[in-house]
Amino acid sequence: MAMTPRERFQAVFRGELPDRVPVTLFIQDQGHFINQMYPDIDPWDYRAIQLKVIEISRQLGADVFVRLLFGTLDPFQWMFFGGLNVSEETETWEVHTDETSDGRTTIRRSEIRTPGGTLTQEFSIDEIRPGTFMYACTGKPVRTMADLDLVRRYEPGMPAWWPAAVRERVAPIRAALGDDGIVGCWSPHGPFNMASLLVDEQDLYCMFYTDPDFYRELMELSLARVAAYTRAIDAAGIDVHIVGGNAPGGFLGRRNYEQHILAYERRQIQLAQATGTPAIYHNCGQIMQLVESYKGLGVVAVEPFSPPPQLGDADLAKVKELVGGDYVVVGGVDQVLVIQRGTVEDVQRVTARTMEIGKPGGHFILQNADFLEYGTPPENVEAFVRTAVEHAGY
């Protein structure tokens, strides 16, 4: 008997063999491909966009995987992109933000005054095309142990109203989706990613050698400041957490990852999965050095195993061999060189081959490696889904 898409995903997450490999689309819920397909939707009308992700995924015949981020997580959303909580104020956390724009890039410069001292940060929003934005903390707020201590002592925690609000934001998406797929949420990143949003990455990548005390305190704070948000997201009715782990990529090497990063990342995964909700660990860069290391996370799934030559270094056949079913492999047809820039025939050929490699033994979900880009031919996306489903059966 054929499974529903929801049953299909859940079976794979439980380590069971479904009726066929789940075939899904990674569509970001603002800008990019969704803006291409629905240019008249307000890019800040998050619910409407998320409903359109469901609509187009259904139309194309995919098992729907809605990845909630935009509008779902305010005020944590801005901390997710980088920096401190400048949305909330208390008597001991006074925020002054100056906003400037050149018509394309908006820069928010914040000064945060506390009884113990002042912190500063800069956050940039770059509209790379109408309706598509890039976000980054371009001036990191933590430079010293003293700065770190100010954050630990004075940054406001999760607002009391937030758990109910995030439940209200998830509920209509869950209801609209039904059994046609799963609702995922971009939960707090792993602590190394969270740390990279507070301190300069050039310092972070060697800090476990140059200043191990600072590094340890930074990791502990990076876990502590998002714990309540993680629990609230988990209780909001989602089906899967997506946990960012791209900052500690394969270029750091297996030894550095296992000795200095893995134990902290595992704690965030344990928290996310504490009530039985599965998590997907997301590393969209170099990954082959860490494929076996990720077994130590205890995570249910890892994505997206971006293929070479442009996106990453993943060798899917080698990945399946190394993983051996210890976690679900989610990936990974090249969304740029194949789906965006290739012909329909290219898409069909690569998709069929990827399914042929990934399907045996189960523990596999097929999707475009990372989110679909603006300018992707819809006929290529249709060919990807159709070809994948044709070859997906067990």
How should these model regions be labeled?
Residues 53, 106-108, 169, 200:
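Generic hydrophobic, aliphatic-rich segments that mediate packing or membrane embedding
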Residues 48-50, 106, 315:
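Glycine-rich, flexible loop segments associated with nucleotide phosphate handling
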Residues 66, 95-96, 136-139:
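Short secondary-structure junctions
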Residues 1-46, 113, 118, 122, ...:
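Active-site loop segments of alpha/beta catalytic cores
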Residues 34-91:
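Segments that shape or occlude catalytic/ligand-binding pockets
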Residues 88-127:
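Serine/threonine-rich low-complexity intrinsically disordered regions
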Residues 81-95, 280, 288-290:
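Amphipathic repeat-derived elements
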Residues 82-86, 96-100, 192, 236:
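Intrinsically disordered, low-complexity segments enriched in polar/charged residues with Gly/Pro
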